[in-house]
């Protein structure tokens, strides 16, 4: 299907199109799914103007009506898979982490959440034939856990076979250059970084290395520290809900993978079984497409359990965290 140019939208001339692109709205679909208020603020346009533009974009993109299951299946053909290169984990995900979806990793400290995030920041730059997506990575760091030295170790530790003809594996420095890191200092700043990600993705697409992975490590840390106590819970959940939906719209527009890590807490009311539960409640639970519980095991092993998915059965996979990266047991 041929992509539509935003200048084809009735009422959008070259000047307006430039404003929209600068704000990160580079496709007709991204405009069609925006709200008038968001579009007006981002592109500095009048709200009445943005309402007309959004209406026209929805008509062009055929968004807002019912579609048959066949139509949905056809769109699913655009979904790509990002591999961890650990066969057991990739099988758990049905071939890898999906684009146009949010995958949540939750678990206690040291369970491997940030390690998997670092590994995928490397892997996403590989060509599709080698399990990657041939793109760049945006990494929103809320806990100061991003370590470039770890990226270098993982880049050097890649074990690749059957390289495509003419393909040269990037150097560790080249891998690092394609990971764009932003340190979030507050929940509001974290939410604004999704808007900044739209603008940066526009530039990177033009450079030939589109954004194919967006990582937030961790999703709830800043929200949790700023909104303490039950009296602030409603406000926190409202902001978190908006943040998650903005993230989903971003990766849906970019056909990219969203990976978020999440903290956990103990459920004191549970008398039997594992009392560990993720932060964020139903808001995160309903918005994340895939939820994976990570926990430590014996002899340095880690266990990844897929606990929620719209199309895959529950299951477990084991892996090791080594100097060279995430590896099979």
Curated annotation (Swiss-Prot):
Indicate yes or no for the key word DNA-binding.
yes
* GO biological process, alphabetically ordered: DNA recombination; DNA repair
Question: Does ATP-binding appear among the keywords?
Answer: yes
Task: List residues binding ATP.
Answer: 107-114
Q: Which SMART domains match?
A: AAA
UniProt GO molecular function: ATP binding; ATP hydrolysis activity; ATP-dependent DNA damage sensor activity; damaged DNA binding
Listed A to Z, the keywords are: ATP-binding, DNA damage, DNA recombination, DNA-binding, Nucleotide-binding
Q: What does this protein do?
A: Involved in DNA repair and in homologous recombination. Binds and assemble on single-stranded DNA to form a nucleoprotein filament. Hydrolyzes ATP in a ssDNA-dependent manner and promotes DNA strand exchange between homologous DNA molecules.
| Similarity comment | Belongs to the eukaryotic RecA-like protein family.
**Name used for this protein in its record:** DNA repair and recombination protein RadA
Task: Give the species this sequence originates from.
Answer: Methanocorpusculum labreanum (strain ATCC 43576 / DSM 4855 / Z)
């Amino acid at each position: 299907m041929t992509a539509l140019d935003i200048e084809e939208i009735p009422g959008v001339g070259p000047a307006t199109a430039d404003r929209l692109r600068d704000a990160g709205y580079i496709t007709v679909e991204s405009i069609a799914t925006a709200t008038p208020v968001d579009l007006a603020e981002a592109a500095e346009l009048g709200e009445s103007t943005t309402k007309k533009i959004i209406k026209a974009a929805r008509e062009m993109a055929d968004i807002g009506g019912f579609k048959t299951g066949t139509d949905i299946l056809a769109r699913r053909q655009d979904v790509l898979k990002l591999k961890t290169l650990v066969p057991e984990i990739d099988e758990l995900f049905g071939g890898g982490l999906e684009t146009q979806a949010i995958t949540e990793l939750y678990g206690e400290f040291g369970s491997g959440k940030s390690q998997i995030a670092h590994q995928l920041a490397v892997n996403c730059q590989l060509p599709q034939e080698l399990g990657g997506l041939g793109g760049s990575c945006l990494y929103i760091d809320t806990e100061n856990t991003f370590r470039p030295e770890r990226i270098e170790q993982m880049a050097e530790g890649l074990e690749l076979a059957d390289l495509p003809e003419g393909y040269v594996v990037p150097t560790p420095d080249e891998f690092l250059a394609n990971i764009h890191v932003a340190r979030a200092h507050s929940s509001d700043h974290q939410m604004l970084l999704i808007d900044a990600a739209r603008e940066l993705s526009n530039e990177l697409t033009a450079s030939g290395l589109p954004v194919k992975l967006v990582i937030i490590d961790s999703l709830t840390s800043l929200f949790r520290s700023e909104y303490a106590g039950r009296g602030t819970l409603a406000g926190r959940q409202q902001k978190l809900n908006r943040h998650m939906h903005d993230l989903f719209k971003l990766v849906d527009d970019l056909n990219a993978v969203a990976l978020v890590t999440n903290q956990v807490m103990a459920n004191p009311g549970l008398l039997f079984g594992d009392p560990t539960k993720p932060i964020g409640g139903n808001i995160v639970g309903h918005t994340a497409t895939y939820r994976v519980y990570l926990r430590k095991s014996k002899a340095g092993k880690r266990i990844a359990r897929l606990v929620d998915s719209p199309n895959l059965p529950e299951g477990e996979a084991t892996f090791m965290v080594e100097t060279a990266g995430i590896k099979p047991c």
